[in-house]
Structure formats: structure tokens, C-alpha cells
């Protein structure tokens, strides 16, 4: 059986709705730069990322590593908000509660 080697040039499929989310994130980051008076050159120097990568982040490019987005958010002082993205998982809590309630019913029967 042949061993499959992952294709490093393959990128994730990004649906239009999710693409819009990334574009909005890029717009928000770009606006945060402007509000602070930061340039792409300054962000590039502080993160060690190329200006091309910074520009791609501003555009919400899905091919840019999430780590690069976090590096830029860190320079902007915005990582705390990013860390809380999936913190309040209301649907997950409801599903967990249903599962726990079903377990409890089986135990008491």
C-alpha cells in the first residue's frame, strides 16, 4: 500500500460566507492599523512578517497562517478578543446538557 504524502500546496476550501468573515477580519485589522497610525512597514518590522503577508492579512486571505494573523493582532493589542472566539459555545453547552440528561435518565431507570 503506497504512503500518501500530504500536498503542501493544497489549500482549504473556503465557502463564500466564510470568505466574507475573513475579509471582514482583514478590514477590521486594516482599520486598527489606521486608528493607531501604524504602517505595513511598522507591522512588518514588529512581527517579522513580509509586507506582502501583511497586505494579504488586510485582505483576509485564507491562505495566510492563523499564527500570522495572531502575530499581527498581538502587535495591535487585540489577541484577548481573538482568544475568546469560541469561548461562549452556547450550542455546545446545550448539546452537552442534553447528553448528560439522557445519561441521567438511563441511570435512574
Kindly give the residue locations of the regions a language model identified.
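A short, Lys/Arg-rich alpha-helix, primarily the initiator
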Residues: 11-35
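N-terminal intrinsically disordered/low-complexity leader segments
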Residues: 1-14
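Short, charged recognition helix plus adjacent turn
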Residues: 83-109
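Short, basic-rich loop-to-helix N-cap that marks the start of a DNA-contacting helix
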Residues: 61-74
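Short alpha-helical DNA-recognition segment
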Residues: 37-55
Amino acid at each position: 500500500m503506497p504512503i500518501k504524502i500530504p500536498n503542501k500546496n493544497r489549500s482549504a476550501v473556503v465557502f463564500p460566507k466564510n470568505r466574507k468573515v475573513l475579509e471582514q477580519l482583514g478590514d477590521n485589522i486594516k482599520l486598527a492599523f489606521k486608528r493607531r497610525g501604524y504602517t505595513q512597514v511598522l507591522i512588518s518590522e514588529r512581527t517579522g512578517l513580509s509586507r506582502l503577508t501583511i497586505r494579504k492579512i488586510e485582505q483576509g486571505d485564507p491562505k495566510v497562517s492563523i499564527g500570522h494573523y495572531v502575530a499581527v493582532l498581538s502587535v495591535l493589542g487585540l489577541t484577548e478578543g481573538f482568544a475568546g472566539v469560541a469561548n461562549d459555545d452556547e450550542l455546545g453547552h446545550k448539546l452537552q446538557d442534553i447528553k448528560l440528561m439522557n445519561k441521567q435518565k438511563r441511570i435512574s431507570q
